[in-house]
Amino acid sequence: MINHFSVLGIKPSAKEDDIKKAYRRLSNKYHPDKLLGASDEEKEQASQQLERVKKAYEVLSDPKLRNAFIRDFNNVIVTDPNSAMRELWDQFYP
């Protein structure tokens, strides 16, 4: 399960304004139009990361979705720690 808080680089206690600021900062960072001189591969990776950022913002900016995410995230049982670590690693180094 992707941790939307980690994607945006914020704490679970973040306020709505902090969520917006993180979203704006990251969407500017990963937007393809901002990546002048980047290779096609780098642009593709940035595009994938931008989609993660958009999804995280969509979930965390809506109070109902945010509460459901927190509830579900707290109920996740890690059955394969290696897989969980790979997923976490891939969030930061796609």
Curated annotation (Swiss-Prot):
SMART domains listed in its UniProt record: DnaJ
Gene3D superfamilies tied to this protein: DnaJ domain (1.10.287.110)
Domain statement: The J-domain is required for stimulation of DnaK activity. The C-terminal extension of 21 amino acids is essential for AtcC binding and to support cold resistance.
UniProt keyword Disulfide bond present: no
Function: Involved in cold adaptation. The J-domain is functional and can stimulate the ATPase activity of the DnaK chaperone. May work as a co-chaperone of the DnaK system to support cold resistance.
Domain (J): residue spans on this chain: 3-93
This protein's name: Adaptation to cold protein J
SUPFAM superfamilies associated with the record: Chaperone J-domain (SSF46565)
